[in-house]
């Protein structure tokens, strides 16, 4: 059976992704001062304006404006001609403390008894399509925007500007990647570059080095800056908001998504911690040879430590029944938020870098949820 799966990714200068990085930059700064800080930081950007808002409770707070300006500067919005200028943009800060009604459910004497900071559904996924056990389309889309960012930041293409995005379509035969059918690449640029020259350089220097030759026997359709011009970009062209790239940060549509984003949230928020745990469980199932594909869904209720449901779907590729796997995971893996936070070291300031391209696969290399150290029974 044949089907096509398409996934997208965006550069670090995309307006939505910019907001994710600012929010997680704020979170890292908070955790550096107070590892027990509670945060739900949102960011919105438009033209030369940035708004930080949400809920924060911490014993010591950083200079939020300075943190935001540093993140914007590092991304590349460092001069007035880009519309957004890190040194001169208007920044508004509107934080208030976390609700005491929520705090009483997540703050206990014993860390192990910490309740979930909210209800929610989190999904983790793994498959054999890449060495990192990630879906191929989102992996390739991510590789394209990373290369685009690298060429801009290294000075290799001085006419590139911070905004950009990629989209990759992969045709599957009987559940396995067969060929790449379409690649879309949009790259913001200065007005003095010719469209035909830009397209040829991006094809040769960005796209072709990323695409696996085995999947391009039939040359894919390439759409590079399809409108012909992409000068007005970033927040000058489109407003940005945290959490709007949650699917491309995860599995690119290859798996279900509970709807919650990660950006700006401390580890008591199960949108973050549950997503890491679900990825860990799914990846370990596949790495152990128990399935070729695995999706793990977790659900939590606010104030309760144990998940209210654990489900597994191996899409007919499992060596044992999905129900058996789900029961074993629930019985043998401690899924209480406080335990997961300690196991994965989630009170550390590790989030801004993960916000750039997402926390899974190659992007999460070295992170605890990417380990494959879960031991299953021999009889499995």
PLM-predicted stretches and their roles:
Residues 4-11, 49-57, 122, 126-127, ...:
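Short glycine-rich or small-residue beta-strand-to-loop segments that form or flank ligand, phosphate
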Residues 194-286:
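Glycine-rich anion/phosphate-binding loop at the beta-strand->alpha-helix junction
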Residues 12-33, 126-146, 265-289:
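Alpha-helical support elements that line or immediately flank enzyme active sites
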Residues 8-10, 14-19, 115-130, 231-255, ...:
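Conserved phosphate/anionic-ligand binding catalytic regions in large, soluble enzymes, centered on
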Residues 39-59, 302-306:
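Short, charge-patterned binding micro-sites
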Residues 1-40, 46, 372-375, 380:
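N-terminal, positively charged regions that mediate nucleic acid binding
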Residues 46, 291-293, 300-380:
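Internal helix-turn-beta structural module
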Residues 6, 66, 73-232, 356, ...:
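Glycine-rich, mobile lid/loop segments that gate access to catalytic sites or pores
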């Amino acid at each position: 059976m044949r089907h096509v799966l398409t996934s997208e990714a965006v550069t670090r200068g995309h307006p939505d992704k910019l907001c994710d990085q600012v929010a997680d930059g704020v979170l890292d700064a908070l955790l550096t001062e107070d590892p027990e800080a509670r945060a739900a930081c949102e960011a919105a950007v438009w033209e030369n304006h940035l708004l930080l808002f949400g809920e924060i409770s911490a014993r010591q707070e950083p200079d939020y404006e300075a943190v935001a300006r540093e993140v914007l500067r590092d991304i590349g919005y460092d001069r007035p001609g880009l519309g957004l200028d890190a040194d001169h943009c208007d920044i508004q800060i509107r934080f208030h403390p976390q609700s005491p009604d929520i705090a009483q459910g997540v703050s206990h004497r014993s860390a192990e008894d910490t309740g979930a900071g909210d209800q929610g559904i989190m999904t983790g996924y793994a498959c054999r399509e890449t060495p990192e056990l990630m879906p191929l389309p989102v992996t390739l889309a991510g590789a394209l925007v990373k290369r685009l960012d690298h060429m801009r930041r290294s000075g290799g293409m001085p006419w590139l500007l911070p905004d950009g995005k990629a989209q990759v379509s992969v045709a599957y035969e009987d559940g396995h990647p067969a060929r790449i059918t379409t690649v879309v690449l949009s790259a913001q640029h200065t007005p003095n570059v010719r469209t035909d020259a830009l397209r040829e350089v991006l094809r040769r220097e960005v796209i072709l080095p990323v695409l696996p030759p085995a999947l391009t026997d039939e040359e894919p359709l390439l759409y590079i800056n399809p409108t012909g011009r992409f000068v007005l970009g970033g927040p000058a062209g489109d407003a940005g908001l945290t959490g709007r790239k949650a699917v491309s940060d995860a599995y690119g549509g290859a798996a279900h998504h509970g709807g919650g984003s990660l950006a700006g949230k401390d580890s008591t928020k199960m949108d973050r911690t549950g997503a890491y745990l679900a990825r860990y469980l799914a990846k370990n199932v596949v790495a152990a040879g128990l399935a070729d594909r695995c999706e793990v869904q977790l659900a939590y209720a606010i104030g309760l430590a144990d998940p209210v449901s654990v489900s597994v779907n191996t899409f007919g590729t499992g060596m044992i029944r999905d129900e058996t796997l789900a029961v074993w995971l629930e019985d043998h893996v401690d899924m209480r938020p406080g335990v997961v936070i300690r196991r994965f070291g989630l009170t550390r300031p590790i989030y801004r870098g993960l916000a750039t391209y997402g926390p899974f696969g190659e992007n999460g290399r070295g992170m605890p949820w990417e380990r494959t150290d879960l031991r299953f029974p021999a009889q499995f």
